[in-house]
C-alpha cells in the first residue's frame, strides 16, 4: 500500500474519524429539532398527515398499489397474510410524461386504466395505495397536491392538482379510498409488516439514486427530505463535481452518499490524486464514470478477463492505488450514512420509542460491492448510539408494501371517526 494515500485522503476529506461522524450526527439532530420547532432548517420534516401506530394495520381485503416514482409505473394487488405481504397481478408500463409532455387528463387517465385492469381481477379491493415520489403537499384526508415534478416527467397541468382525487375520478369501476404517500414514508410503513419483535421506533430509509429518511414526530409520519441537509463540510471534490451539475448547491448531503453522484465524486477524487502525484491521471480527463462503474472497479473489475473503462484509463501499476482511492469514496458514504441514521435512531429513543427498526431500501445501500455497506453501517451506528437497540431490515418492494399499509391506516382512521 502506498503510505501517502491515507495522508492524502485525510487531508482532502475522505477519511472521516469518529469525531467527524459524531459531528454529522449532531448536525442532523439540530436540523431536525429546528424544523420541528418551525425554525430555519435545511430539513423540511414534511407532515404526511398519517397517524402512526407501531402495530401493523390489518386488512383482510386486497389493496391495489401504484408506484409512480421513476421511468416505470407499476401497479399490483397486495394481500397481508400470516406469511407476510403477497403480490399478484404486478404490471409495469412507462410512466406517463416520461416520453414527452402529456396533459393532466392523459396523465391521470393512463394510471386509472392500469388500476382498472388490476381491479377487474380483484373486485373486492379495499382501496388504492398511491406511492407518488414527487414533491407534494400532504392533505389530512390522505390525498396530496403536486408541488413540482422531477425525474424528467413532463405533465405541467398536474401541478397543483390533488393526484389521488384526479385518479379516482377517472376509475371506470367507481370510486375507491386512496392514500397518496412519498416513497420514504411508505418504506417506513412497510416496516410494520415485519414479523418478529415489536419495534415502537420506526424509520424509513432510502439510499439509491438519492437518499432520504422518514420518521415519527408528534404522532405522525414525517418526510425529512434529509438529503437536503447542508450542515456538514464538503470536500473540494464534492464542490468541484457539484459545480458541473444543473442543480448546483441543491441537496448537498445527498450528493455525498447516493448513487446518482458517487461516480462523479469518485472521478474528481481520482483526478485530485493524480494532481497529488499518487497516480498518472493522463487518461482521466475525458472519462465519465457512473456509480455502478466505480463500484465495479472498486470490487475488482478491470483485469484481463473483466475489462473496465477506468482500468483502461490507468497505467497497470496505478490500478491498486486507484482501487484504494475508490474504496475511500464508499467508506465515506458508509460513515455519513451511519451518522445520518444514528441521529434519527437517537431521537426516536429519546422520545421513548425503542427498539428502533430501520426499513432500508435502495440499490446503493443493498447492492454496493466495493465494501460491505450494510455491515459497516450497522457497526458504525452501534458505535454512535451504543445504548439504543436497533435493527435494519430489507423488505422486497418496500414502497409498495408501505402504500398498502397506508390504505389500512387510512381505513382505520375513518372507522375511528365514524364511531367517535
Residue ranges and their predicted role:
Residues 85-87, 150-160, 186-265, 271:
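Glycine-rich phosphate-binding loop of actin/hexokinase-like ATP-binding domains
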Residues 73, 135-139, 212-214, 231, ...:
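Short, acidic Gly/Pro/Ser/Thr-rich loop/turn segments
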Residues 68, 154-159, 177-186, 204-207, ...:
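Active-site nucleophile and cofactor-binding loops and adjacent substrate-binding regions
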Residues 61-67, 127-129, 177-179, 202-206, ...:
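Short glycine-aspartate micro-motif
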Residues 1-90, 94, 98-126, 193-194, ...:
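ATP-binding/phosphotransfer module of carbohydrate and carboxylate kinases, centering on a glycine-rich
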Residues 92-112, 131, 136-196, 201-203, ...:
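Glycine-rich phosphate-binding loop and adjoining helix at the ATP-binding site
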Residues 58, 66-74, 133, 184-185, ...:
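A short acidic Gly-Thr/Ser loop motif
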Residues 58-60, 123-124, 174-175, 183, ...:
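Short, well-ordered loop/turn elements at secondary-structure boundaries
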